[in-house]
């Protein structure tokens, strides 16, 4: 598999070297995606998507604190966060997967909300992070499990429950908060 490692390294370097293409200056946020067309040009999907910012927060290194990352988070907060009576964060604008209430931008997803919470932890906004951890605990089913997403108007669970992904991100987030609150060693 050494050839695969070389290919992956080459692709990672290409992504890093072309990082600017991932940002939509008009929207002020990272793009949801793009498609390389047969003629070599790019077709962009400029939908506001929390996973695009999460990828930068988790994997981009020096771009983490960059102005474009901050703008992306601000766009997500102002456009998507807590825009329904149930609170939380849909994955992206006009997400219609299990769409239950079309007037809203999409159904709140626990995973998407926790990705933003992990950004808050990394930027030492612990009170804000804890607010959404409490929100998630409040939305658990009586058995203590979480679904994939919730109805934006009623807060009722939608899609599969339990969803291991929701639980895994909750554990990751709890560990991140715990680590962030540990006294720093001199």
Q: What annotation goes with each model-predicted range?
A:
Residues 1-8, 160:
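Aromatic-lined, polymer-binding surfaces characteristic
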Residues 41-67, 108-186:
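C-terminal capping/lid segments that line or modulate ligand- or cofactor-binding pockets
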Residues 3, 100, 154-157:
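Short coil/turn segments at secondary-structure junctions
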Residues 5-111, 123:
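Extended ligand-binding clefts on enzyme/binding-domain cores
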